[in-house]
Amino acid sequence: MKRIIIVGATSGIGKEVAMIYLKTDCRIGIAGRRTDALKELQAIAPDKIEIQPIDVTQEDATDNLLKLIEKTGGMDLFLLSSGIGNQNIELKPDIEIRTAQTNVVGFTRMVDTAFNYFKQHGGGHLSVISSIAGTKG
């Protein structure tokens, strides 16, 4: 049975990917900031889904990802689907900083942790959902 970890699974593409994997013979670990949304998804298939609240902008995100991997029984595929994008016509620094914390620092935390897990365990698949908004405005 494949073990899939999805960070950013409480909405959007991450949630839809989790729903697709529910139809397969996989064990799924899902993470996101909204605990209530995680619990709603887990209620659909409590025998197949493990949950762990993770805010990728926080320093404990890496420890929480490792907890989720352990709960799920390991990891064969990691999908990072967390990210934000806001129009910031006035270039307010707080909006830019929050975006960078999520899309750069959070990305780095999660991908580094997943990569190192795979390196220690003989491989796996690392996948991310990103955007070209930075080049297209």
Q: Residue locations for each model-derived region?
A:
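Residue(s) in the substrate-gating loop at a strand-loop-helix junction
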Residues: S131
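Short alpha-helical oligomerization interface
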Residues: I89-Q101
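Conserved NAD(P)H cofactor-binding loop of Rossmann-fold oxidoreductase domains
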Residues: S81-Q87
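Rossmann-fold cofactor-recognition segment
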Residues: A45-D60
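Hydrophobic positions on the long internal alpha-helix
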Residues: L79, M110-A114, F118
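Conserved glycine-rich Rossmann-like NAD(P)H-binding loop of the short-chain dehydrogenase/reductase
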Residues: C26-E40
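Conserved glycine-rich cofactor-binding loop
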Residues: T10-S11
